[in-house]
């Protein structure tokens, strides 16, 4: 459980200026519980444009739960499965969390999944919001979630989303496949260039 607000500004110079290394990855996903208890992590930097599963958490799965946490002033860059909080959520839950800051996905074509809260959702998200400035020249981008294949309830997005070149771009989600979104909305500004598919 988190007990104070955390100033993560120093992460900008970590790991040869690549910044924070996400908690959980494809070989060792995060499967535990993190309760922010209403506190924030401020100014975290993760500058990893050639890596996947980027965010505070990279890959969260197998019943894991992240709750009651704010991520503010984040600067995030990754290839695919990129989010302000979590890169990818799989059979896990996020509740009462929010993100602000900037995010960029560098993956090619539709393989760059990126969203203000998380890049790809195959779990459950409840009572969360995101206000991020999100951009990618290629990819599936959403103000809240990039690629949604799970459940989202009582959540919203603001901020702005900019995509181009064969991308799918949405104010709330970039792509929604056989998935449930309830009592949620977006006020994000969406800008599409070239032959992007806006929504």
Describe the predicted segments one by one:
Residues 1-199:
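Surface-exposed repetitive/solenoidal architectures
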